Amino acid sequence: MEKKRFTIPFMPVHITTEAAIAMIFIGVLFILAGVLPKEMMEPADKLVTPIGLKPEWYYLWAYVILEMVPNKLMGILIPGVMVGALFAVPWLERSKERRPAKRPIAVGVFTAMMLVVAALTYYGATIQIGG
Amino acid sequence: MNWLEERLPGIGKVAEDIAEHPVPSHTLNIFYCLGGLTLLAFLVQCVTGLFLALYYKPTPEAAFASVQMITNEVRFGATIRSLHHWAANLMILLVFLHMLRVYYTGSFKKPRELNWLAGCFLLVLSLGLAFTGYLLPYEQLSYWASVIGAETAGSLPVVGATMKIMMQGGIKVTAEMLSRFYVLHVMILPLVTIGFLVAHFIMIRVQGISDPM
């Protein structure tokens, strides 16, 4: 486990690399904002419920579970438990080993969960919900 | 520097400590930049959010019109709003990717369990900021997304009914919902987020960046 640690100084090597990446990020943001600006949509109408309502992409996985599970309480509890499990990761996986290849079960379970979330997001993005 | 040192003894040591702090070379890797970029996205949100707050009016009657004004009339308003929109989306994507990096490199393991926990809170806070901010333009989608959010919270056992009333400002959706989401979005959640960010960074400094695998 004892490895030689190669270090670089914070000034100026690390800080300039960080600054370069930060500038690229800000550039990408401006390009996105310029090419795909946020447009106005219709104002809120309390009397008309829109058909086929979908949340933003980061909530889609949970929304699909909510819509798919017939029992509403279970539909909330399942995403809740999934997020709760995330908080508990360091206590669910206690081994000292860090290389993914040496902890196949934990990495397998975690990867499977992430793939489920990704698949649900894809599913939610492609299907028509409700209506 | 001498001028400062005379007035603030010890400041030279602090500056030296920051400048000469050695960083492990394996962190010069794009996967190790994701956390820093998430912070940058958050800072962009603070700055653009401040400008949007100058013109935004958090009442059901005026909200949509004020966002319309920001988009169509205010100088650079459309740009600032688009930047706020994209930085919000990228922040969530980045916080998620940062979590994947920390998980797969096993960096959350002893002694860094508490920092993983702080990171989880920051993920949930990011989602909360996105959820509360989504209502503010008071568009059809934003209004009904919040209604569904309140309904969903309402079907929780024990706390559900109270949570729904607290979110809606009444048994039914009231005008209070917008002010509550506004206060959450611009005051409470950002302050809590900054608190967790500070804890996150202090822990990194105390524990050091994890060794290469």
Curated annotation (Swiss-Prot), chain B:
Pfam families named in the record: Cytochrome_B
Cofactor binding note from Swiss-Prot or TrEMBL: Binds 2 heme b groups non-covalently with two histidine residues as axial ligands.
Binding, heme b 1: H98, H200
Record's keyword terms, sorted: Cell membrane, Electron transport, Heme, Iron, Membrane, Metal-binding, Photosynthesis, Transmembrane, Transmembrane helix, Transport
Disulfide bonds: none
Keyword Lipid metabolism carried by entry: no
Subcellular localization, as worded in the UniProt entry: Cell membrane
Record-listed heme c binding positions: C33
An example Gene Ontology CC term for this record: plasma membrane
Main function: Component of the cytochrome bc complex which donates electrons to the photosynthetic reaction center.
Miscellaneous comment as given in the Swiss-Prot or TrEMBL entry: Heme 1 (or BH or b566) is high-potential and absorbs at about 566 nm, and heme 2 (or BL or b562) is low-potential and absorbs at about 562 nm.
Subunit relationships: The subunits of the cytochrome bc complex are a Rieske Fe-S protein (PetC), cytochrome b6 (PetB), subunit IV (PetD), and a diheme cytochrome c (PetX).
Protein name in the entry: Cytochrome b6
Organism of this sequence: Heliobacterium mobile (Heliobacillus mobilis)
